[in-house]
Amino acid sequence: MNPKLAHGAQRVEALLQDRSEANAHFFQTEAERLARLCHKMAERFAREGRLVAFGASPSDRSDARHVAVEFVHPVIVGKRALPALGLAGEGGQIAPQVALEAEAADIAMAFGGEPDILAALAAARERGCLTVAFTRDSGAEWEFDLGVIADPLIRQEIAETLYHTLWEHVHIFLDNRGLLEGRAARPVHDSGASSFLYPFLGQQETDLDAILADVKQSILLKADEISALRTQTLSEFAGELLDAGRVLRERLDAGGRLIALGNGGSATDAMDVVADFRTPMFGGPPRRALDLTEDTGIITAVANDIGTDAIFLRQVIAYGREGDVLLALSTSGNSLSILEALREGRRRGMVTMAFVGYDGGNVAANSLADHVFISRSENIPRIQEAHASGYHVLRELVELAEPPAEP
């Protein structure tokens, strides 16, 4: 093997190992507390409370928006939409927004530890909100100290799995409403279409301690699942990631830019990709990048006048140039808006890349991207988490790639 390629492969392996160790340690330590937090959150939702998530930095903004999407638009057919808001810097400072919006029954979830975020948490607690934060000394009622993880990209990946597991398991307690404060007990719960998420749960469980124990085990199982899927994604596609990192570095150094897109939770991943290139958390230089999910005026205009299939296509026509790189994120690989954008990107001479799930969908079957990375799962939260690891590693590999030789 080429020595440079061997070094790159070793780096991918090391990045994977760091993630596996951090994931195992965090969830082994915190699974029981996470189960109890799910119960407390369910009590708030049962009182018609809302989740109010907020973050100030570009990366934290993407997480606030991601967690809101998951609660409002559940991927499990038949599960209720739970009210959630994602507040970010577009509305000004965060603390005044939270002070204006938060209500006593709400759940306040803070991403980041800037003074503005800490002030927002204080305002939420004053209102009577249940408060959750991912940094120490935040003043939140529920703190999960991710600061002990040195790599900021890994911290963000662990946070994503954390809030996915909260969303996945809150529904258990809502289905067992007799376990919620102020609610009459019911003899059975109905996990229905979500039963695949909770393999440890019996259908007539009524004891809180027993359900908490089951939820803890389910959270640990999900932590194992993402570790395995992350390993598959980064190991199977290590060579492809190295090649993509080199090509992306060449295009960026030549004046091109990265253009990212996705739908739903994957739209917030596109936000994060662009944040990682524009304002990298790991100390690398800023790189040119554009988020096609950002301008709601353009998206809604195209959706209204033409149709949702064209929301990215029209923007690729407007912004895409030969020399740019188009990066698509899709859990299914079948979204028509993604397929149309990739086809147009190729017509324009752009390098096309895609992170997909399942078996790769139409993106992989029809070779619609030059570089395809498949997280082989049908579990949408786990796919998104593996994608985050994939594009975070890709971002680091861009800086490890040698710049193109001078002509």
Task: Tell me what each language-model feature is.
Residues L248, A260, A267-D269:
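N-terminal amphipathic, basic helical "cap/leader" segment at the start of enzyme domains
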Residues E48-S59, R257-L261:
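Short glycine-rich phosphate-binding loop at a beta-alpha junction
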Residues T29-R47, L234-A254:
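A short, well-structured juxtamembrane/interface segment
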Residues A244, G265-S266:
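N-terminal, charged amphipathic alpha-helical interaction modules
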Residues A56-L179, S266-E406:
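Glycine-rich phosphate-binding loops that contact phosphosugars or nucleotide phosphates
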Residues A22, G49-R50, A104-I107, A254-R257, ...:
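Short, surface-exposed connector motifs at secondary-structure boundaries
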Residues M1-H25, G182-T233:
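Cofactor-/ligand-binding subdomain signature composed of acidic, glycine-rich
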